[in-house]
Protein backbone atom coordinates (compact mmCIF):
# COMPACT_ATOMS: atom_id res chain seq x y z
CA UNK A 1 0.00 0.00 0.00
CA UNK A 2 1.07 3.60 -0.36
CA UNK A 3 0.41 7.19 0.47
CA UNK A 4 0.39 9.37 -2.63
CA UNK A 5 -0.91 12.88 -2.09
CA UNK A 6 -1.15 14.90 -5.27
CA UNK A 7 -0.47 18.57 -4.74
CA UNK A 8 -0.29 21.57 -7.02
CA UNK A 9 2.42 23.43 -5.19
CA UNK A 10 5.08 24.73 -7.56
CA UNK A 11 8.65 25.27 -6.44
CA UNK A 12 11.05 27.01 -8.81
CA UNK A 13 14.24 25.11 -9.43
CA UNK A 14 16.65 26.25 -12.09
CA UNK A 15 16.68 24.13 -15.21
CA UNK A 16 18.20 24.51 -18.63
CA UNK A 17 20.16 21.99 -20.67
CA UNK A 18 22.46 19.12 -19.67
CA UNK A 19 23.63 17.50 -22.89
CA UNK A 20 24.64 13.88 -23.21
CA UNK A 21 28.24 13.62 -24.29
CA UNK A 22 30.12 11.14 -26.40
CA UNK A 23 30.87 7.83 -24.74
CA UNK A 24 34.43 7.91 -26.04
CA UNK A 25 37.09 7.29 -23.43
CA UNK A 26 40.79 7.74 -23.12
CA UNK A 27 42.32 4.35 -22.52
CA UNK A 28 45.71 2.73 -22.35
CA UNK A 29 46.66 0.00 -24.79
CA UNK A 30 48.29 -2.86 -22.96
CA UNK A 31 50.93 -3.00 -25.70
CA UNK A 32 51.85 0.67 -25.63
CA UNK A 33 55.38 1.78 -24.96
CA UNK A 34 56.06 2.42 -21.27
CA UNK A 35 56.92 6.02 -22.15
CA UNK A 36 53.49 6.65 -23.65
CA UNK A 37 52.02 9.90 -22.34
CA UNK A 38 48.33 9.75 -21.58
CA UNK A 39 46.38 12.77 -22.88
CA UNK A 40 46.56 15.54 -20.32
CA UNK A 41 43.66 17.83 -21.11
CA UNK A 42 40.28 16.44 -20.13
CA UNK A 43 37.42 18.08 -22.01
CA UNK A 44 34.66 17.42 -24.55
CA UNK A 45 34.63 13.65 -23.96
CA UNK A 46 33.22 11.32 -21.36
CA UNK A 47 36.16 10.35 -19.17
CA UNK A 48 36.90 7.09 -17.28
CA UNK A 49 37.39 8.91 -13.99
CA UNK A 50 35.76 8.67 -10.57
CA UNK A 51 36.33 10.89 -7.55
CA UNK A 52 36.06 10.49 -3.79
CA UNK A 53 37.31 12.18 -0.64
CA UNK A 54 38.77 10.72 2.53
CA UNK A 55 36.95 11.29 5.81
CA UNK A 56 40.11 10.79 7.84
CA UNK A 57 42.99 12.26 5.87
CA UNK A 58 41.08 14.92 3.94
CA UNK A 59 42.60 13.76 0.66
CA UNK A 60 40.95 13.91 -2.77
CA UNK A 61 41.10 10.70 -4.82
CA UNK A 62 40.93 10.37 -8.61
CA UNK A 63 40.47 6.83 -9.91
CA UNK A 64 40.90 5.83 -13.55
CA UNK A 65 38.74 2.73 -13.87
CA UNK A 66 40.05 2.08 -17.39
CA UNK A 67 43.76 1.74 -16.56
CA UNK A 68 43.39 1.26 -12.77
CA UNK A 69 45.49 4.31 -11.94
CA UNK A 70 45.04 6.36 -8.76
CA UNK A 71 45.99 9.96 -8.02
CA UNK A 72 45.90 11.32 -4.46
CA UNK A 73 45.73 15.07 -3.91
CA UNK A 74 45.93 17.09 -0.71
CA UNK A 75 43.41 19.86 -1.49
CA UNK A 76 44.96 22.16 1.12
CA UNK A 77 47.88 22.50 -1.30
CA UNK A 78 45.60 24.04 -3.96
CA UNK A 79 45.82 27.82 -4.12
CA UNK A 80 42.55 29.32 -2.89
CA UNK A 81 41.42 26.27 -0.91
CA UNK A 82 39.58 27.64 2.16
CA UNK A 83 41.34 25.63 4.88
CA UNK A 84 41.56 22.33 6.72
CA UNK A 85 38.01 21.05 6.25
CA UNK A 86 36.04 17.87 7.04
CA UNK A 87 35.13 16.75 3.53
CA UNK A 88 31.92 14.93 2.60
CA UNK A 89 30.94 14.33 -1.07
CA UNK A 90 32.29 14.75 -4.59
CA UNK A 91 30.95 15.24 -8.11
CA UNK A 92 32.89 15.08 -11.36
CA UNK A 93 31.30 16.29 -14.58
CA UNK A 94 31.21 13.92 -17.59
CA UNK A 95 34.08 15.68 -19.36
CA UNK A 96 36.28 15.20 -16.32
CA UNK A 97 37.18 18.89 -16.37
CA UNK A 98 35.41 20.02 -13.21
CA UNK A 99 35.09 18.56 -9.71
CA UNK A 100 32.81 19.67 -6.89
CA UNK A 101 33.56 18.88 -3.25
CA UNK A 102 31.37 19.52 -0.22
CA UNK A 103 32.52 20.04 3.36
CA UNK A 104 30.82 19.90 6.75
CA UNK A 105 30.14 22.87 8.97
CA UNK A 106 32.62 23.57 11.81
CA UNK A 107 32.97 26.30 14.45
CA UNK A 108 35.58 27.95 12.20
CA UNK A 109 34.09 27.33 8.75
CA UNK A 110 30.69 27.25 7.10
CA UNK A 111 29.78 24.23 5.05
CA UNK A 112 31.14 24.72 1.55
CA UNK A 113 30.51 23.62 -2.01
CA UNK A 114 33.87 24.03 -3.76
CA UNK A 115 34.34 23.99 -7.54
CA UNK A 116 37.70 22.81 -8.91
CA UNK A 117 38.83 23.11 -12.51
CA UNK A 118 40.87 20.17 -13.80
CA UNK A 119 43.56 21.77 -15.96
CA UNK A 120 45.51 18.66 -16.83
CA UNK A 121 46.12 15.16 -15.59
CA UNK A 122 49.07 12.81 -15.94
CA UNK A 123 48.18 9.28 -14.92
CA UNK A 124 51.70 7.95 -15.43
CA UNK A 125 53.23 10.58 -13.16
CA UNK A 126 50.29 10.43 -10.76
CA UNK A 127 49.70 14.18 -10.87
CA UNK A 128 46.81 16.49 -11.60
CA UNK A 129 46.71 20.29 -11.89
CA UNK A 130 43.68 21.76 -10.13
CA UNK A 131 42.44 25.33 -9.75
CA UNK A 132 39.83 26.59 -7.30
CA UNK A 133 37.13 28.22 -9.42
CA UNK A 134 34.61 28.99 -6.69
CA UNK A 135 34.05 28.57 -2.96
CA UNK A 136 30.33 28.68 -2.18
CA UNK A 137 29.45 29.07 1.50
CA UNK A 138 26.17 27.31 2.28
CA UNK A 139 25.69 28.71 5.79
CA UNK A 140 27.57 30.34 8.69
CA UNK A 141 30.22 28.75 10.94
CA UNK A 142 28.77 26.87 13.87
CA UNK A 143 25.41 26.09 12.27
CA UNK A 144 24.01 23.07 14.15
CA UNK A 145 22.16 20.16 12.60
CA UNK A 146 18.37 20.16 12.71
CA UNK A 147 17.87 16.43 13.00
CA UNK A 148 14.98 15.22 15.18
CA UNK A 149 15.94 13.91 18.60
CA UNK A 150 15.77 10.13 18.59
CA UNK A 151 16.40 7.45 21.22
CA UNK A 152 16.61 3.67 21.20
CA UNK A 153 13.61 1.90 22.75
CA UNK A 154 14.66 -1.72 22.17
CA UNK A 155 17.73 -3.88 21.65
CA UNK A 156 17.16 -4.33 17.92
CA UNK A 157 17.66 -0.73 16.80
CA UNK A 158 20.44 1.30 18.45
CA UNK A 159 21.11 4.92 17.51
CA UNK A 160 24.70 5.15 16.21
CA UNK A 161 26.60 8.39 16.61
CA UNK A 162 27.63 8.54 12.94
CA UNK A 163 24.05 9.21 11.84
CA UNK A 164 23.39 12.00 14.33
CA UNK A 165 24.97 14.99 12.60
CA UNK A 166 26.81 17.60 14.60
CA UNK A 167 26.46 20.42 12.08
CA UNK A 168 25.39 21.05 8.52
CA UNK A 169 26.36 18.19 6.21
CA UNK A 170 25.90 18.53 2.44
CA UNK A 171 25.14 15.16 0.85
CA UNK A 172 23.27 13.66 -2.06
CA UNK A 173 24.76 15.33 -5.16
CA UNK A 174 22.67 14.84 -8.30
CA UNK A 175 22.75 16.30 -11.80
CA UNK A 176 19.52 17.33 -13.53
CA UNK A 177 19.70 15.99 -17.11
CA UNK A 178 19.39 18.50 -19.95
CA UNK A 179 20.19 21.39 -17.63
CA UNK A 180 23.08 23.36 -16.17
CA UNK A 181 22.12 22.47 -12.63
CA UNK A 182 23.58 20.41 -9.86
CA UNK A 183 21.72 19.65 -6.64
CA UNK A 184 22.89 18.87 -3.14
CA UNK A 185 20.81 18.12 -0.05
CA UNK A 186 21.47 18.96 3.57
CA UNK A 187 20.26 15.75 5.16
CA UNK A 188 20.90 17.41 8.54
CA UNK A 189 18.18 19.98 7.78
CA UNK A 190 15.47 20.59 5.17
CA UNK A 191 17.42 22.47 2.51
CA UNK A 192 18.07 21.49 -1.10
CA UNK A 193 20.99 23.44 -2.57
CA UNK A 194 20.99 24.38 -6.25
CA UNK A 195 24.22 25.18 -8.12
CA UNK A 196 24.63 26.37 -11.70
CA UNK A 197 27.61 24.28 -12.80
CA UNK A 198 28.34 26.62 -15.70
CA UNK A 199 28.66 29.73 -13.50
CA UNK A 200 29.61 27.99 -10.22
CA UNK A 201 26.99 29.93 -8.28
CA UNK A 202 24.25 29.08 -5.84
CA UNK A 203 21.22 30.06 -7.89
CA UNK A 204 19.88 33.38 -6.65
CA UNK A 205 16.17 33.35 -5.89
CA UNK A 206 16.00 29.56 -6.00
CA UNK A 207 18.56 28.39 -3.47
CA UNK A 208 17.89 26.99 -0.97
CA UNK A 209 14.74 25.01 -1.75
CA UNK A 210 12.71 24.29 1.39
CA UNK A 211 9.43 22.37 1.17
CA UNK A 212 7.92 21.58 4.59
CA UNK A 213 7.03 17.93 4.91
CA UNK A 214 9.20 16.94 1.96
CA UNK A 215 12.80 18.11 1.96
CA UNK A 216 13.65 17.19 5.56
CA UNK A 217 16.49 14.64 5.90
CA UNK A 218 16.69 14.08 2.15
CA UNK A 219 19.75 12.35 0.73
CA UNK A 220 19.58 13.48 -2.87
CA UNK A 221 16.78 14.25 -5.32
CA UNK A 222 17.45 11.53 -7.89
CA UNK A 223 16.24 12.34 -11.40
CA UNK A 224 15.25 9.95 -14.16
CA UNK A 225 17.21 10.07 -17.41
CA UNK A 226 14.87 12.56 -19.04
CA UNK A 227 15.08 14.88 -16.05
CA UNK A 228 11.30 15.02 -15.71
CA UNK A 229 10.80 13.32 -12.32
CA UNK A 230 12.90 13.41 -9.16
CA UNK A 231 12.72 11.10 -6.16
CA UNK A 232 13.90 12.19 -2.71
CA UNK A 233 14.88 9.65 -0.05
CA UNK A 234 14.20 9.79 3.68
CA UNK A 235 17.63 9.36 5.24
CA UNK A 236 16.74 9.23 8.91
CA UNK A 237 14.98 7.02 11.41
CA UNK A 238 11.28 6.36 10.84
CA UNK A 239 11.15 8.21 7.54
CA UNK A 240 9.22 5.77 5.36
CA UNK A 241 8.40 8.14 2.50
CA UNK A 242 9.88 8.68 -0.94
CA UNK A 243 9.14 12.23 -2.11
CA UNK A 244 8.09 12.58 -5.75
CA UNK A 245 8.75 15.77 -7.73
CA UNK A 246 8.10 16.80 -11.32
CA UNK A 247 10.68 19.13 -12.84
CA UNK A 248 10.17 21.56 -15.70
CA UNK A 249 13.47 21.87 -17.52
CA UNK A 250 12.44 25.00 -19.40
CA UNK A 251 10.84 27.09 -16.65
CA UNK A 252 12.80 25.71 -13.73
CA UNK A 253 9.68 24.82 -11.76
CA UNK A 254 9.39 21.72 -9.61
CA UNK A 255 5.90 20.42 -8.84
CA UNK A 256 5.43 18.40 -5.68
CA UNK A 257 3.50 15.40 -6.96
CA UNK A 258 3.27 13.43 -3.74
CA UNK A 259 4.88 10.84 -1.50
CA UNK A 260 5.15 7.07 -1.74
CA UNK A 261 5.11 5.11 1.51
CA UNK A 262 7.16 1.93 1.78
CA UNK A 263 4.30 -0.12 3.20
CA UNK A 264 1.36 1.28 5.15
CA UNK A 265 0.71 3.12 8.41
CA UNK A 266 0.88 -0.10 10.43
CA UNK A 267 3.80 -1.86 8.75
CA UNK A 268 6.46 -0.06 6.76
CA UNK A 269 10.17 0.13 5.96
CA UNK A 270 12.20 3.21 6.86
CA UNK A 271 15.49 5.06 6.39
CA UNK A 272 16.43 5.07 2.71
CA UNK A 273 19.78 6.23 1.38
CA UNK A 274 19.53 6.04 -2.41
CA UNK A 275 17.15 5.50 -5.34
CA UNK A 276 18.04 3.87 -8.66
CA UNK A 277 15.90 4.42 -11.74
CA UNK A 278 15.02 1.45 -13.96
CA UNK A 279 13.36 3.52 -16.68
CA UNK A 280 11.24 6.68 -16.94
CA UNK A 281 8.51 5.33 -14.66
CA UNK A 282 9.94 2.71 -12.31
CA UNK A 283 12.72 2.91 -9.74
CA UNK A 284 14.03 0.85 -6.82
CA UNK A 285 15.05 1.87 -3.34
CA UNK A 286 16.26 -0.01 -0.26
CA UNK A 287 15.82 0.49 3.47
CA UNK A 288 18.21 0.34 6.41
CA UNK A 289 16.21 0.50 9.67
CA UNK A 290 15.65 -2.69 11.70
CA UNK A 291 13.08 -1.81 14.35
CA UNK A 292 11.16 0.92 16.16
CA UNK A 293 12.67 4.00 17.80
CA UNK A 294 11.31 6.84 19.93
CA UNK A 295 10.20 8.51 16.68
CA UNK A 296 7.99 5.61 15.64
CA UNK A 297 4.30 6.47 15.47
CA UNK A 298 2.01 4.78 17.98
CA UNK A 299 -0.03 3.46 15.04
CA UNK A 300 2.97 1.51 13.73
CA UNK A 301 2.86 -2.17 14.57
CA UNK A 302 6.10 -3.10 12.84
CA UNK A 303 9.11 -1.59 11.11
CA UNK A 304 9.82 -3.85 8.15
CA UNK A 305 13.55 -4.69 8.36
CA UNK A 306 16.00 -3.91 5.53
CA UNK A 307 14.40 -4.68 2.19
CA UNK A 308 14.18 -3.57 -1.46
CA UNK A 309 11.14 -1.83 -2.96
CA UNK A 310 9.91 -1.28 -6.51
CA UNK A 311 8.51 2.23 -6.96
CA UNK A 312 5.85 3.01 -9.57
CA UNK A 313 5.93 6.79 -9.97
CA UNK A 314 2.84 6.81 -12.18
CA UNK A 315 0.57 4.98 -9.74
CA UNK A 316 2.42 6.19 -6.65
CA UNK A 317 2.90 2.73 -5.20
CA UNK A 318 5.70 0.73 -3.62
CA UNK A 319 6.03 -3.05 -3.74
CA UNK A 320 8.47 -4.99 -1.59
CA UNK A 321 10.44 -7.21 -3.98
CA UNK A 322 13.33 -8.39 -1.76
CA UNK A 323 12.73 -9.34 1.87
CA UNK A 324 15.10 -9.42 4.80
CA UNK A 325 17.12 -12.51 5.72
CA UNK A 326 18.88 -13.43 8.96
CA UNK A 327 21.36 -15.75 7.26
CA UNK A 328 24.50 -14.81 5.38
CA UNK A 329 23.55 -17.24 2.62
CA UNK A 330 19.91 -16.26 2.71
CA UNK A 331 18.08 -15.07 -0.38
CA UNK A 332 17.33 -11.58 0.86
CA UNK A 333 18.87 -8.44 2.36
CA UNK A 334 21.23 -9.49 5.16
CA UNK A 335 22.58 -6.17 6.48
CA UNK A 336 21.27 -2.61 6.12
CA UNK A 337 20.88 -1.89 2.41
CA UNK A 338 22.87 1.30 1.92
CA UNK A 339 22.91 1.55 -1.87
CA UNK A 340 21.78 -0.30 -4.96
CA UNK A 341 22.29 -0.35 -8.70
CA UNK A 342 20.72 -2.18 -11.61
CA UNK A 343 22.97 -2.98 -14.57
CA UNK A 344 22.87 -5.70 -17.23
CA UNK A 345 19.63 -7.08 -15.82
CA UNK A 346 21.06 -7.58 -12.34
CA UNK A 347 20.32 -5.87 -9.03
CA UNK A 348 23.36 -5.12 -6.86
CA UNK A 349 22.90 -4.22 -3.19
CA UNK A 350 25.61 -2.68 -1.01
CA UNK A 351 25.04 -4.02 2.51
CA UNK A 352 26.63 -2.27 5.47
CA UNK A 353 26.92 -3.26 9.11
CA UNK A 354 26.34 0.16 10.70
CA UNK A 355 22.85 0.24 12.20
CA UNK A 356 22.66 -2.86 14.38
CA UNK A 357 24.31 -3.67 17.72
CA UNK A 358 27.66 -4.29 16.10
CA UNK A 359 29.56 -1.84 13.94
CA UNK A 360 31.58 -2.65 10.84
CA UNK A 361 32.06 -6.33 11.54
CA UNK A 362 31.45 -7.06 7.88
CA UNK A 363 29.93 -5.84 4.63
CA UNK A 364 28.52 -7.58 1.59
CA UNK A 365 27.47 -7.03 -2.02
CA UNK A 366 24.37 -9.01 -2.89
CA UNK A 367 23.43 -9.82 -6.48
CA UNK A 368 19.98 -10.69 -7.85
CA UNK A 369 18.69 -11.52 -11.32
CA UNK A 370 16.17 -8.78 -12.14
CA UNK A 371 14.83 -10.21 -15.39
CA UNK A 372 11.46 -10.12 -13.65
CA UNK A 373 11.48 -6.87 -11.70
CA UNK A 374 8.58 -8.03 -9.57
CA UNK A 375 10.37 -11.22 -8.51
CA UNK A 376 14.16 -10.84 -8.25
CA UNK A 377 16.09 -14.12 -8.10
CA UNK A 378 19.05 -14.38 -5.73
CA UNK A 379 22.35 -15.14 -7.46
CA UNK A 380 25.01 -14.75 -4.78
CA UNK A 381 26.45 -12.57 -2.02
CA UNK A 382 30.06 -11.38 -2.28
CA UNK A 383 31.70 -11.92 1.13
CA UNK A 384 34.74 -10.53 2.98
CA UNK A 385 37.76 -12.81 2.89
CA UNK A 386 36.32 -14.80 0.01
CA UNK A 387 35.10 -12.64 -2.85
CA UNK A 388 36.07 -9.35 -1.17
CA UNK A 389 39.31 -8.41 0.61
CA UNK A 390 39.85 -9.85 4.08
CA UNK A 391 38.67 -7.34 6.66
CA UNK A 392 36.32 -5.65 4.22
CA UNK A 393 33.30 -4.06 5.90
CA UNK A 394 30.52 -1.55 5.24
CA UNK A 395 29.72 -1.60 1.53
CA UNK A 396 28.39 1.97 1.52
CA UNK A 397 27.98 3.36 -1.99
CA UNK A 398 27.88 2.07 -5.57
CA UNK A 399 28.78 4.17 -8.60
CA UNK A 400 28.32 2.35 -11.93
CA UNK A 401 30.51 3.34 -14.86
CA UNK A 402 28.46 4.86 -17.71
CA UNK A 403 28.86 1.77 -19.90
CA UNK A 404 27.68 -0.44 -17.00
CA UNK A 405 30.80 -2.59 -17.32
CA UNK A 406 32.00 -1.88 -13.80
CA UNK A 407 30.65 -0.93 -10.41
CA UNK A 408 32.81 1.18 -8.11
CA UNK A 409 31.94 0.30 -4.52
CA UNK A 410 33.34 2.40 -1.68
CA UNK A 411 33.75 1.54 2.00
CA UNK A 412 34.47 4.53 4.22
CA UNK A 413 35.11 2.26 7.22
CA UNK A 414 37.52 -0.41 5.95
CA UNK A 415 39.27 1.86 3.46
CA UNK A 416 38.52 0.20 0.14
CA UNK A 417 37.25 1.16 -3.30
CA UNK A 418 36.47 -1.93 -5.36
CA UNK A 419 35.97 -2.26 -9.10
CA UNK A 420 33.42 -5.00 -9.74
CA UNK A 421 33.28 -6.53 -13.22
CA UNK A 422 29.56 -6.89 -13.98
CA UNK A 423 30.22 -9.50 -16.67
CA UNK A 424 31.72 -11.93 -14.15
CA UNK A 425 30.56 -10.42 -10.83
CA UNK A 426 34.09 -10.58 -9.50
CA UNK A 427 36.46 -7.95 -8.12
CA UNK A 428 38.63 -6.71 -10.99
CA UNK A 429 40.63 -4.14 -9.01
CA UNK A 430 41.18 -3.28 -5.36
CA UNK A 431 42.29 0.14 -4.15
CA UNK A 432 42.81 0.08 -0.42
CA UNK A 433 45.00 0.89 2.58
CA UNK A 434 48.10 -0.32 0.73
CA UNK A 435 47.46 2.42 -1.84
CA UNK A 436 47.01 5.16 0.77
CA UNK A 437 43.24 5.01 1.23
CA UNK A 438 41.92 5.39 4.77
CA UNK A 439 38.22 6.31 4.77
CA UNK A 440 37.10 6.93 1.16
CA UNK A 441 33.63 8.40 0.75
CA UNK A 442 31.50 10.14 -1.87
CA UNK A 443 32.45 8.02 -4.90
CA UNK A 444 31.17 9.53 -8.15
CA UNK A 445 31.93 8.27 -11.67
CA UNK A 446 32.02 10.80 -14.50
CA UNK A 447 28.93 10.41 -16.67
CA UNK A 448 26.69 9.40 -13.78
CA UNK A 449 23.82 11.47 -12.43
CA UNK A 450 24.58 10.76 -8.78
Give the label of every model feature segment.
Residues 44-46, 94-96, 176-179, 225-226, ...:
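Residue-level detector of Asp-centered blade-edge/turn motifs that repeat once per structural unit
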Residues 29-74:
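An edge-strand/N-cap motif at the start of beta-rich repeat modules
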Residues 86-88, 169-171, 188, 217-219, ...:
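Beta-rich catalytic cores
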Residues 36-48, 103-112, 234-235, 285-305, ...:
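Short, conserved, GDST-rich strand-edge loop motifs in beta-rich repeat architectures
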Residues 51, 90, 173, 221, ...:
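Hydrophobic core register within WD40 beta-propeller blades
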Residues 62-69, 115-128, 194-202, 244-253, ...:
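Short loop/turn segments immediately following beta-strands, especially the blade-tip
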Residues 74-83, 126-166, 205-214, 255-270, ...:
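Surface-exposed loop and turn segments in beta-propeller and other repeat-based domains
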Amino acid sequence: MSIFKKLNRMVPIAAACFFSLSASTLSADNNQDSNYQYPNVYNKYLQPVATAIDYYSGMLYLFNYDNDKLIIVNPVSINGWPGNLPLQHTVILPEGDKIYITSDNTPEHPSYIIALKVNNIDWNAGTVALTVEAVMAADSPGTPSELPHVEAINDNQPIPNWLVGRGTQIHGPTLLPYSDYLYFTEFTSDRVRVVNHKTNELVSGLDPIVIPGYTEQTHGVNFNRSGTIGLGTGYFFDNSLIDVYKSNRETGELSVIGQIMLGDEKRHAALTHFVYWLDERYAVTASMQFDKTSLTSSSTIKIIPPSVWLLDTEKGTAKRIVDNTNKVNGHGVFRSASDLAVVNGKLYIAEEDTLDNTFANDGYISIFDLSDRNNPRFIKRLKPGKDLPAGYSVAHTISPTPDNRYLLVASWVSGYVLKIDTATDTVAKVWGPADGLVKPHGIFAAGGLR
